[in-house]
Amino acid sequence: MIDHIGFEVSDLQRSARFYDAVFFALGVRRMIDTEKAIAYGINAPQFWIVRRGRSPAPGYGHVALQASGRAAVDAAHRSGLGAGGVDDGPPGLRPQYGRRYYAGYLKDPDGLRVEVVAQ
């Protein structure tokens, strides 16, 4: 249903270090890299970070990234923390969302909330 998502960020390279680490753990790669934007994906660019233009603040703050399993959730969470992210909920079961819903939460360098989930 969603073709792509983009976040406006205050420092493109700082945010790229964070997303490079998280996406590497999920098997996702950079597909586009310009002065103003970086896009990640598997077969097509689906997740964009864009250098903030005239907006007064970075964009919307939550996206859920699909992982292949619990180990990938753990690895992405660890990688994000090592790349400047802030823990916003350690990996674990979230029964309020479903019996097998396993997720970890991070805040990226701009404070945008990133969930990594396996179901």
What is the role of each PLM region?
Residues 50, 98, 105, 116-119:
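Short beta->alpha transition motifs characteristic of CBS
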Residues 29-32, 92-94, 117-119:
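Conserved catalytic-core motifs of GNAT/GCN5-like acyltransferases
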Residues 40-75, 79-82:
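Long, continuous compositionally biased terminal/linker segments
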Residues 1-3:
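Extreme N-terminal starter segment of soluble prokaryotic enzymes
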Residues 11-13, 65-110:
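Vicinal oxygen chelate
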